[in-house]
């Protein structure tokens, strides 16, 4: 069965794993998913991830979730731009998440990055998701 929104599928897997207090979650691999996970790791929302490839050519990413004193670091993770309704923002209209406590992840011409990086580089793009 194919997934119509691979990034949304990964975010849902993370949300469900955090709700069940799992330490790891796996998802099929893609370049976009890996770039989003790079941002999440750099911002301190996940411990890390490993990518492995199987004999049949399929690749999988195993994400190691992060907890602080038993409480999940990720409280909320939501998809903003969806396949049926893309959301694009200019650098001036990049929203702050919970007054700057959370982050937005954007796909820009300069790559996938967090909202504060996009403001520094003065670039807008597709608003992929919000994390708090």
From Swiss-Prot:
GO molecular function, one term: structural constituent of ribosome
Disulfide pattern: none
Keywords noted in UniProt: Ribonucleoprotein, Ribosomal protein, RNA-binding, rRNA-binding
Record-annotated membrane-spanning stretches: none
PROSITE patterns the UniProt entry points to: RIBOSOMAL_S8 (PS00053)
UniProt keyword rRNA-binding present: yes
Gene Ontology CC terms, in alphabetical order: ribonucleoprotein complex; ribosome
GO biological process, one term: translation
Matching Gene3D superfamilies: 3.30.1370.30, 3.30.1490.10
Signal sequence interval, chain numbering: none
Quaternary structure note: Part of the 30S ribosomal subunit. Contacts proteins S5 and S12.
Family: Belongs to the universal ribosomal protein uS8 family.
Function, in words: One of the primary rRNA binding proteins, it binds directly to 16S rRNA central domain where it helps coordinate assembly of the platform of the 30S subunit.
Xref: PANTHER family: 40S RIBOSOMAL PROTEIN S15A
Name of the protein in question: Small ribosomal subunit protein uS8
Organism: Brucella melitensis biotype 1 (strain ATCC 23456 / CCUG 17765 / NCTC 10094 / 16M)
